[in-house]
């Protein structure tokens, strides 16, 4: 039957069709919407209306079947586009169902078919959208089972240990039912154990770049068998911190590999990832409009530097209302530790699979700070406040990091203080709140931070503390997100925390109480005071080394900070009591902004009544008039002349309110800048650059404002119409001075050989720095590759790597294990080496063999025990083992019969001893 034909036999013979398909008795309503009147035509014997009747019947039947399928209750209806339609094997589909995935997410639906088709893919989607499963599912489908040939086939590189652990967890869950071997190679773990893992011929390697490069150099690994490479959080991996490691790793990978790049923040241009070796990649960018979850409520508080600790305590106590003291999960764990009734097996199972009731509570909060010194300081401060706190940062010991994160996941602690090491990849269940104690310097870091909450359809809140110095970064974030900037309580009716960037101050009285408590604590506790001083020094270094904001945002920030809405009470505090706080803030602002009409010289001269002071009074009046004239001219120069030159700060605060303000009548809707999709030309029009440009525009008159030389009918811009410059700048890979490919390409010059040996004209000198330890100037190149003055050696790719990577520990490990030549790639694996890496689903069992107990004639099982003794004696006689001792222990007797190799070895040793003694034989003496 063709696709255009329709079978009506089931409708004509409904009972028979039902009996053939399903014999189970079930109640079913008759399709009431099926119109059978079309068959009861008066002219039914004619042929004129036959085709129309059939068409109407078929249409009615199809409509009824569609309604029937949608109205089925308690019965599942398979929809198109699921995992079943992707051609996955049965074991993998069972693992996906067991994991809880029913319908693939958009990134999985777009990516998995491309990966199974052996295409290179660059994928970007929001945090929490299932990117990890998008590359793990096709990897397991392609690798299928363990290969007996030596050589790993899959490699997943992650920028942090926590993200690698999260990926390992997903691989274990989705790889259940297969015998694939997977290893985790991260820093902080024992190198000797990882030597054993790699010797066991794993199929999948999940690693961080530093430790994997160390093992590659130390073990001289051959990566020619790698077929599947994944760069997770690719924009972070390709930054300057991992440049040397990736160069060496990529050099060893084969050209025929399949390369995948995934991250939540990726630019459109793939030039920055050219070193990854992509071959005709497919770019999949989803959710570019909604870069953060629509269920996330974002709040931005303006604070002063001295009030940050008090503002943090105010948020925790009064806004989030985090309870102090020990948590319920902590009490339960302490009671179990005291009682000791639970067995070791039960404790181990609870650690591996925490109870859902012991997961983080609704008060669970992550606090992001700038440096590890801030982590120590804030954790100690909150612990003194009575909160249950965990902490983690990059240089913390791996075991300690696991314990701290596990305490937060299981609910033993309510607060987790971390650096940006936890901004990518840590999947904390039921996380409600994120606090940015130090505002991020890049918009994409903010996206990764707040992406820890509001996942899987749950609501979440993010609170950010913004100082005056952080205002340019806030405006960069506003441009990146393409949202409206709402300041203070002036527009509290229209403020939307999920769709706007709402900025405002905090309640002065509450902050004052918290700041007073912090000051008292610092005076009493010398340890916390020392931690604060160290954190302040680390903050100075962090501010000097962080990426700078855009010039336009820095210019706009001056007007934004000077506005009244910057310090106005935040719309979040919308209650009756806050109205008094608003009036109090206004009064304090009036008092603080009071300026007397006359100077002290004029007031004292008038009071004195002396004639000699008239000259000083006249001089001060002239100076004041001159200053006022200059100030008025400066204000006139800064004012925009046209509607298109309105500052972006004022424009952003009024977006969406044009109809209310009357702008909709005078201004076309297309003239309003859409910050989410702003092109280069729109950015040039939106932002006024300098005052002299506005003066030149005044002179040009209406000629420039009326139109340009561009004919909109024929003009073709060099950038796409939907190109957002601010968005691409936020997604770009930031790596020190070379933060942009365009800027780096400008510095590139043609390298021509000179005919003179001296330095060429305008050639930059090699930048040096003073090394305090060695008391000499050293090159700054070592700072960029992370070696910091350490000894370097050249790798296989020519890149300089740390000399400590070739320490000889692998040779010592082989010697201790008495291993000879390791099998090479392509050879059959050695089964004896595979015991270090268990296959998926394999259980460890005790295989210790003990001698049977002596048979007792007076017991009922005498014959059974006697038979076991005879079998043991027979086995000992076959293997050359002799029984000794009264407990039935065994010992293998050394055979004194020498083999051919033993005889040859003994002869060589004898010859060496003879040459060493250098004594002539007795025959020689006789001659």
Curated annotation (Swiss-Prot):
Record's subcellular location: Nucleus, Nucleolus
InterPro entries: DBP10_C, DDX54/DBP10_DEAD-box_helicase, DEAD/DEAH_box_helicase_dom, DEAD_box_RNA_helicase, Helicase_ATP-bd, Helicase_C-like, P-loop_NTPase, RNA-helicase_DEAD-box_CS
Biased composition (Polar residues): 351-363
Gene3D superfamilies: P-loop containing nucleotide triphosphate hydrolases (3.40.50.300)
Region: Disordered, residue numbers: 1-54, 326-363, 627-671, 683-711, 819-927
A Gene Ontology term for the protein's cellular component: cytosol
Single GO MF descriptor: ATP binding
Enzyme Commission number(s) of this protein: 3.6.4.13
Domain annotation Helicase ATP-binding: ranges: 112-284
Comp. bias intervals (Basic and acidic residues): 627-636, 847-877, 893-904
Ranges annotated as biased composition (Acidic residues): 39-54
Residues involved in ATP binding: 125-132
Keywords: ATP-binding, Helicase, Hydrolase, Nucleotide-binding, Nucleus, Ribosome biogenesis, RNA-binding, rRNA processing
Location of the Helicase C-terminal domain: 348-502
Pfam families registered for this protein in UniProt: DBP10CT, DEAD, Helicase_C
Domain of life: Eukaryota
Residue span of motif DEAD box: 232-235
Motif Q motif, chain ranges: 81-109
Primary location class: nucleus
Family note: Belongs to the DEAD box helicase family. DDX54/DBP10 subfamily.
Recorded domain comment: The Q motif is unique to and characteristic of the DEAD box family of RNA helicases and controls ATP binding and hydrolysis.
Biological role: ATP-binding RNA helicase involved in the biogenesis of 60S ribosomal subunits and is required for the normal formation of 25S and 5.8S rRNAs.
Designated name of the protein: ATP-dependent RNA helicase DBP10
Provenance organism: Coccidioides immitis (strain RS)
């Amino acid at each position: 039957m063709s696709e255009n034909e329709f079978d009506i036999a089931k409708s004509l013979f409904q009972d028979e069709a039902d009996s053939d398909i399903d014999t189970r008795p079930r109640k079913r309503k008759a399709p009431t919407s099926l119109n059978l009147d079309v068959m009861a035509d008066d002219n039914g014997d004619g042929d004129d209306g036959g085709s129309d009747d059939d068409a109407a019947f078929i249409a009615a039947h199809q409509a009824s079947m569609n309604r029937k399928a949608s109205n089925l209750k308690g019965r599942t209806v398979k929809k198109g586009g699921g995992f079943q339609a992707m051609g996955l094997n049965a074991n993998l589909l069972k693992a996906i169902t067991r994991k809880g995935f029913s319908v693939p997410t958009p990134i999985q639906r777009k990516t998995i078919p491309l990966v199974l088709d052996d295409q290179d893919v660059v994928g970007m989607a929001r945090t929490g959208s299932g990117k990890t499963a998008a590359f793990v599912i096709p990897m397991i489908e392609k690798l299928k089972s363990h290969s007996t040939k030596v050589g790993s086939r899959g490699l997943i590189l992650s920028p942090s240990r926590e993200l690698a652990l999260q990926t390992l967890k997903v691989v274990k869950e989705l790889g259940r039912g297969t015998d694939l071997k997977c290893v985790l190679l991260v820093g902080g773990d024992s190198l000797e154990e990882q030597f054993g893992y790699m010797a066991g011929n794993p199929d999948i390697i999940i690693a961080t770049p530093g430790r994997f490069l160390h093992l590659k150099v130390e073990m001289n690994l051959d990566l020619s068998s790698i077929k599947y490479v994944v760069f997770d959080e690719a924009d972070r991996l390709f930054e300057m911190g991992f440049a040397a490691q990736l160069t060496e790793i990529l050099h060893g990978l084969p050209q025929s590999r399949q390369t995948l790049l995934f991250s939540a923040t990726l630019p459109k241009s793939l030039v920055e990832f050219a070193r990854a070796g992509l071959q005709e990649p497919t770019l999949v960018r989803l959710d570019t409009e909604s870069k953060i979850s629509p269920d996330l409520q974002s709040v931005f508080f303006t604070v002063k530097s001295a009030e940050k600790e008090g503002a943090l305590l105010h948020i925790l106590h009064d806004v989030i209302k985090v309870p102090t003291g020990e948590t319920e999960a902590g009490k339960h764990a302490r009671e179990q530790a005291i009682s000791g009734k639970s067995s070791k097996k039960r404790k181990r199972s609870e650690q591996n699979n925490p109870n859902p009731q012991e997961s983080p509570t609704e008060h669970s909060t992550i606090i992001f700070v700038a440096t590890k010194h801030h982590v120590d300081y804030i954790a100690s401060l909150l612990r003194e406040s009575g909160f249950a706190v965990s902490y983690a940062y990059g240089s913390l010991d791996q075991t300690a990091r696991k314990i701290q994160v596990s305490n937060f996941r299981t609910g033993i602690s309510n607060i987790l203080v971390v650096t940006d090491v936890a901004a990518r990849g840590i999947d904390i269940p039921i996380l409600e709140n994120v606090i940015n104690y130090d505002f991020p310097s890049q918009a994409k870091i903010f996206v990764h931070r707040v992406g820890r909450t509001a996942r899987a359809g749950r609501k979440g809140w993010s609170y950010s503390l913004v100082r005056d110095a952080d205002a340019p970064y806030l405006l960069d974030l506003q441009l990146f997100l393409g949202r409206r900037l709402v300041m203070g309580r002036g527009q509290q009716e229209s403020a939307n925390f999920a769709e706007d960037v709402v900025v405002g101050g905090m309640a002065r009285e509450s902050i004052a109480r918290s700041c007073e408590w912090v000051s008292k604590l610092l005076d009493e506790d010398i340890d916390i005071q020392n931690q604060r001083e160290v954190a302040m020094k680390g903050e100075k270094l962090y501010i000097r080394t962080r990426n700078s904001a855009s010039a336009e945002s820095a210019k706009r920030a001056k007007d934004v900070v000077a506005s009244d809405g910057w310090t106005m009470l935040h719309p979040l505090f919308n209650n009756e009591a806050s109205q008094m706080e608003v009036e109090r803030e206004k009064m304090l602002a009036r008092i603080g902004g009071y300026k007397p009409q006359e100077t002290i010289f004029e007031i004292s001269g008038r009071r004195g009544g002396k004639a000699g002071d008239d000259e000083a009074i006249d001089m001060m009046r002239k100076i004041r008039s001159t200053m006022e004239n200059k100030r008025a001219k400066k204000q006139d120069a800064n004012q925009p002349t046209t509607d298109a030159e309105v500052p972006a700060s004022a424009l952003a605060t009024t977006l969406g309110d044009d109809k209310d303000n009357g702008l909709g009548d005078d201004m076309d809707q297309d003239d309003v800048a859409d910050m989410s999709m702003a092109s280069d030309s729109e950015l040039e029009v939106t932002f006024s650059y300098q005052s002299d440009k506005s003066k030149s525009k005044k002179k040009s008159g209406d000629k420039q404002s009326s139109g340009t030389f561009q004919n909109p009918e024929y003009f073709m811009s060099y950038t796409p119409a939907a190109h957002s410059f601010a968005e691409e700048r936020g997604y770009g890979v930031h790596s020190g001075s070379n933060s942009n490919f365009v800027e780096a390409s400008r510095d590139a010059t043609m390298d021509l050989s000179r005919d003179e040996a001296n330095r060429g004209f305008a050639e930059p000198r090699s930048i040096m720095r003073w090394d305090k330890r060695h008391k000499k100037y050293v090159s700054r190149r070592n700072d960029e590759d992370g070696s910091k003055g350490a000894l370097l050696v050249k790798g296989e790719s020519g890149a300089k790597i740390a000399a400590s990577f070739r320490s000889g520990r692998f040779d010592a490990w082989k010697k201790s294990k008495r291993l000879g030549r390791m099998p090479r790639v392509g050879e059959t694996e050695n089964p004896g080496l595979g015991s270090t890496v268990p296959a998926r689903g394999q259980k460890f069992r005790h295989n210790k063999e003990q001698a049977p107990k002596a048979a007792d004639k007076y017991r009922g099982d005498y014959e059974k025990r006697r038979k076991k003794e005879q079998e043991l004696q027979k086995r000992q006689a076959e293997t050359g083992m002799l029984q000794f001792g009264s407990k039935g222990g065994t010992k293998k007797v050394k055979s004194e019969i020498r083999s051919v190799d033993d005889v040859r070895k003994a002869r060589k040793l004898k010859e060496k001893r003879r040459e060493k003694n250098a004594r002539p034989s007795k025959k020689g003496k006789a001659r």
